[in-house]
A protein has these predicted regions:
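Oxyanion/phosphate-interacting regions
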Residues: 25, 46-50, 65-127
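Acidic beta-strand-loop-alpha-helix segment within the catalytic core
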Residues: 1-65, 118-127
């Protein structure tokens, strides 16, 4: 089964393990996860115009999905090429924590495409 609460666990207090989960974007602004070496900063800024942005964090590979899934970041816009194998595991973890990955037209990012190339997308924690 996949869905909120199925992504994974993190250590809580004592020996308790807590499910990871996305967070509601804080009132003081969103944290944007972005790639260390890919993407177009100007396009990202344009896409996020009108959003209250508090900070940007950089991470490699699927770690950006994990930052959203654990509530350490709020949005991950992706410009530039990726392949399905670059995103599938992170997408599953984020979805399991309550987040989403959508193309810029707001339809769900799909898998099994000819050529296995992904379009540009935006991953989000809470909606």
């Amino acid at each position: 089964a996949c869905g909120p609460g199925t992504a994974g666990l993190r250590e809580g207090t004592g020996s308790d393990w807590q499910p990871i989960a996305v967070r509601a974007t804080p009132a003081d602004g969103a944290i944007v996860a972005s790639s260390r070496s890919h993407g177009d900063r100007a396009k990202i800024e344009e896409l996020l115009a009108g959003m209250n942005i508090r900070d940007h964090v950089t991470a490699g590979s699927s770690l950006k999905f994990c930052l959203l899934a654990e509530g350490a970041a709020d949005v991950y816009p992706r410009y530039g090429p990726t392949s399905e194998w670059d995103t599938a595991a992170g997408h599953a973890v984020l979805t399991g924590a309550g987040g989403s990955v959508r193309k810029f037209d707001e339809t769900e990012l799909e898998y099994g495409k000819a050529g296995w190339r992904n379009p540009e997308f935006i991953a989000r924690g809470a909606q």
